[in-house]
Amino acid sequence: MSTNIDILSKMKKLLLLISAVLLSTQLLTAQDVTGTGTRQWTMQQCIDYAMENNITLQKSKLQKESATEDLKGAKAALLPTFSASTNQSLGYQPWKDTGISTVTNGQVNTKVDRTYYNGSYSLSGQWTVWNGNRNINTIKLDKLAEQSAELQTQETANTIQERIAQIYTQILYLAENVKVNEEMLVTSKKNEERGQEMLNVGKMSKADLAQLSAQRANDEYNIVEAQSQLMNYKLQLKQLLELTDEEEFDVVIPDFSDDRILEAIPSLQSVYEQALLSRPEVERSQLAIKSSDVSVSIAKAGWLPSISLTGGVTTSTNSLSGTNWGTQMKSNVNTQLGVGVSVPIYDGRSTKTQVNKAKIQQLQAQLDLQDLQKTLYTDIQQFWLNAWTNQQKYLAATSSVESARQSYDLLSEQFRLGLKNIVELMAGKDNLLSTQQNQLQSKYLTIYNQQMLKFYQSGEIK
């Protein structure tokens, strides 16, 4: 009996464990699926998916692979090249009257071959021993190009992430804006119903009721407009993620606390200093300067001599020679080995032009880096200013919303009692809507600009 009780106890524990696992699975799944079966995406999920599927990013990765192939080709150019060739020809001499004579059993036999063939065979090689370090510098240049292509891919990835953050934040704003307008519509309907009651008892004119009805209709239009904007930005996000299916698409709307919105903004200088060290566009611009230095060296190689080695082995056969093929192949072998030296004397100023243009490109690359650093500082400065300004606006708007709501609640009660007219009621309602929208706008602009500052500082969007 004791054993049976122990078994039952263990089974109950096992069932409880299974139930807990199933419940946890349902809770995890609920993050991705709404009550209607629509998957909800977090911003990080959008970014991760785009990094794997965005076509523009994939094309950028191919550029890096192409640069890698160029580098392999440049390295292979240091090695000697070899080639083999053969030429076979068939000839015919219709009026030939002499041939090869042989003696068999005391008799002389003469064989006249009017058809014959020739064969030639060769193996040759060439090696550039020195060409003013052009090959070595080409390898350096292609290495820099490969690194630059990799950084270009990172730039593309950053651009996509920034765009996702921008669209995602706009979706969050518009989603809340829809809710605000829906709340306004509920209020408008109540006012319209109250107006109808007042009309029935003779306390309101039809003209005043028409204004309330017009306000309700306008609020319905505002909802449609807000929903349309929301759908448009969701579509833009789907396109950025390369989602082409007809599945419903939605995003997770996080709950941003006031502490999150009003958190300390990192200093402008600290963000800029970190961005100079980590942003791929800065590193790529620095590589462009190094590349221009190497390009100058490559151009100057046009003034230097080049040395090359050549060698070859040739042989030939002829069916009329009277000896067998193997003997001919051996006896007709000819080998060659040569050293070539090319010294440039005058090239019509071609090399000087290339050197000067490479130096101009060198200066251009240096100016491009300075311009990029200036643009980077300006962008970060704008993000910082927007974050700080909208934080202050959010504080002011939050206070204004509370005051406007209290004022409108009072106006609504006074209107219900007949102490306020329609104009005052509608003005109060419009003021409340305006302050709520200002609060939402400053809230999400603060969040977006904070995200961008963190992204430029750490390379991650959170």
Residue ranges and their predicted role:
Residues 2-14:
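Positively charged n-region of N-terminal signal peptides that target proteins for export
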Residues 22, 30-87, 93-94, 245, ...:
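Bacterial Sec-pathway N-terminal export signals of envelope proteins
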Residues 58-62, 75-76, 115, 129-157, ...:
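Sec/SRP-type N-terminal targeting helices
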